[in-house]
Amino acid sequence: MTTELLAPAGGQEALVAAVQSGADAVYMGFGAYNARRSARNFSDEEFRAAVSYCHLRGVKVYLTLNTLVTDRELPALAAEARTASECGVDAILVQDWGVLATLQKIIPDVPLHASTQMSLHTLSGVQEAARLGMTRAVLTRELSRGEIAEICQKSPIEIETFVHGALCMCYSGQCEMSAVIGRRSGNRGACAQPTAFPAGRTAIR
């Protein structure tokens, strides 16, 4: 079993820091269809340069296209995916099942990972992701170490799990708290991180 240390790269400084600190891979976004819209992210040219920078140092690059999209938005997302493929991206993370089907048609050689936003929290869910052609499943952040270990033992594909960072109280991909409280949808990449706010008693009427 090989362990991979994966770190987020929300901008150039974060990318360099992750690589210099020993990350085996980084995940990053460019364009409008990733779950890290609050990060600086990368332009097309910056993304191409970032992939080259990482690959020269033996570091893999994963693109996040892991938000829900509408039919109207799908062509633009597909164009971003093609650009990433041309840049040599190592894999793409997705949430939307329609995006999965589209990318399998237009860039069939690029591995696709099931984002934590897909709410995969059982072995059967991971097995279904594998059946549909995904090569890695990012488990939801709410699972215990024991549950993660059990899934890893029987999973037919690679498993990724969060060990540091935002630890949501709701199942990943199913939380509407940010949208209700701050009118910012976590499923559209704009989560306000309400579960990180100081808690108090509030009367709800």
Task: Outline where the language-model segments fall.
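Active-site pocket-lining/capping segments in soluble small-molecule metabolic enzymes
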Residues: 1-120, 138-139, 147-205
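Hydrophobic alpha-helical bundles that form the membrane domains of multi-pass transporters
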Residues: 92, 132-133
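Conserved nucleotide-cofactor-binding alpha/beta core module
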Residues: 122-124
